[in-house]
Amino acid sequence: MTTMRRTLALSILTGALFAAPLAVLAQDIKPRLIRFGYGLNEVSNQGRAVKLFATEVERLSGGKMKVRAIGAAALGPDVQMQQALIGGAQEMMVGSTATLVGITPQMALWDTPFLFNSAREADAILDGPIGQKVMDTLPAKGLVGLVYWENGFRNLTNSKRAVNKLEDLDGIKLRVMQNNVFLESFKTLGANAVPLPFSELFSALETKTVDGQENPFNTILSSKFFEVQKFLTVTNHVYSPWIVLVSKKWWDGLSKDEQKVLMDAAVTSREFERKDTREEAGRAVAELKAKGMQVNELPAAEAARMRDRLTRVNASIGANVGMDLWNETQAALARLRAAPGPKK
């Protein structure tokens, strides 16, 4: 009996040790190298999340699928990478939803000024039916969206003056994304809006080609804009998501098992990235102050004036994304705000 027990125990132990590898071997997974481009540097929240995604893909595929992370816009700005994905010259990327508006107008929904009051609202809408509906417009254009990551609430920096009231924006040369909603929004607010790719931004600030820019705290910190900007105004004027994209040409050639590896890794990376981004954002303002930036918060009354001024822009967004989608989003937000529980 003792010998039988030992044999049984050894069999169970051996099965446990080899179950996971055998499960991977049983899947339809081939050796693949995935070029994954992103715009920020490797020490940014974006870079950290790409690294985690790469680790997860390798783990879930039993080492067969490997991600080559290529940051700092080395493969070009978002728009260039999107075209590379559409043409099948690059496999994956993560970038701003705002730069997709020229490909699918529904993405402009996320550019609506003051759309979300909190990260909780953003998560609920982006990860729910509305976020999926917007993402589902991509395959017809040659792209597949996996998940939304968090870039964060955007805030203003400039080298001229503190922005304490709406009129302080008058005449400031403000870099905006290459996106008509951002262009029209800041023109409407009185700024001289200048569209530029992110990869050219630091140099443009340094040479005074532009006076200022708007980005989340994390990006302001990791991109060292404090070296070329003096004033930071907390406005939270737009919540910016990032989106993890795959070339549809390449995606369609993957097995279901390979697609599942990428999707599962993307979901894991989303949870990590949002937590990491929010924790860093909580520390970033203090760090930016320590770096010498003068920080002020836009008064609520002035934020309300901005909202009123942007009414026309919001109406045009509704028309461009489709009124059914616009109304569905507003109704979903109203339900979230009426529900009991935390609002943050």
Question: Where are the language model's segments positioned?
Answer:
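N-terminal secretory/targeting leader peptides
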Residues: 27-121, 129-132, 136-344
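Short, low-complexity disordered leader/linker segments with a strong preference
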Residues: 1-33, 340-344
